[in-house]
């Protein structure tokens, strides 16, 4: 993978000049000048997904120049490097192969001279056997009762991905009740334990090293709670499984290592739902649906790795994002799913994007002088319309938005879905085209009112429009289409990281806070005043000690 400063490319200089030409052009003008704009700036994927990027401040020339940027930064070479198992995560000397986990073609993928696919398939088969025993009721707890509840204990990628997917795929779930615990705040595990029965609960402890502070603190609390009822430590093996590679620590915890499901260093945490970390997904929706999830992602992987840039959906969305982030100065992107099952989708890609591309050091080890990853946020529609859309419509900040919705709902109650989708379509139209002063005044005339008498109100009802959006319309949210959608965003993030010359797959930014917390923790064990930090941190710790006494 080549290390190329994007701002030093001729394409970047051309884009800067092009921005000067485009910055005052409106989306309304672009549509007025091209009756075929939708056809030119939209694409479908497998007749399952329509991506409409026509309501953006772009022209064919814009996309051509952005594609030149992708060529000059050798995006094609980087894609080939990732899919072929090269160690593109150089700061950790690791390959990046979440694509291998969903490689349904089963073509060999070589890391360090070894095909990883036999091990991937073996873990999948092991998860299949285990999950079928749990779901069927064949697996019994220590009192002979079948499992009714599953508690996934993990944090970050070991929590956000499985939680998001099990929520999105609720229409496919079986009889097992899923719970997710991540926060080291004891309230999280305490509230979940109130809901479950130790005789019928299975705990999944998701930690590659089996040393993650938050996860192991919660796991030991769950174990202590369980043993208060079960008594004998041998019963732990019937109620705990591990998603880990540390067989020694897993065995010491009391888990049978036969129920330890491995994954590999080339699986990044925020890309791990496709691995053994996805066991909670399998237990929720069944193995066949998990395979469909993998298959959808694999289909998008093939699209991403083989489709020319001008028709490649992850690349197109990534380039449009760079256009706003690096030329228009937009600092955030909103992900707005019009489907309640997707209520954790934005939170998932908040981690996916911000932990991946929130870097200020480039691949050469130098501080960048350009913007890297955007701030990602969002909530389901229509809730967001009654919360933060005001700022998107009439605020002073540009917020490019992705609107996502299924054409077919899993819950066809009355006309709910038509009302939901009417809002989905209306919002992107309103953001793009706005409402002029003339229209506001005419609306008053149509109501029999004199606009002159309401001059004090008219300016506040004007919408400038020209707010950019992408619309992603799915035929229906299924395991397959969800897999494709997740992979679409994963590859968008990768593409932006390549072009911006940063390492997308490490996360050193999470380390300093953890190191300092480990230093502070022993200082909280007594009531002595602390003076070893700055005055602010000392003051906070000492007030905490005074109040807890």
From Swiss-Prot:
Domain of life per record: Bacteria
Q: Which UniProt keywords apply?
A: Cytoplasm, Gluconeogenesis, Glycolysis, Isomerase
Enzyme Commission number(s) of this protein: 5.3.1.9
Signal peptide from the UniProt entry: none
The UniProt entry lists the main location of this chain as cytoplasm
Query: Do you know which NCBIfam families this protein is assigned to?
Result: PRK00179.1
What is the protein's given name?
Glucose-6-phosphate isomerase
Q: Which organism is it from?
A: Salmonella paratyphi A (strain AKU_12601)
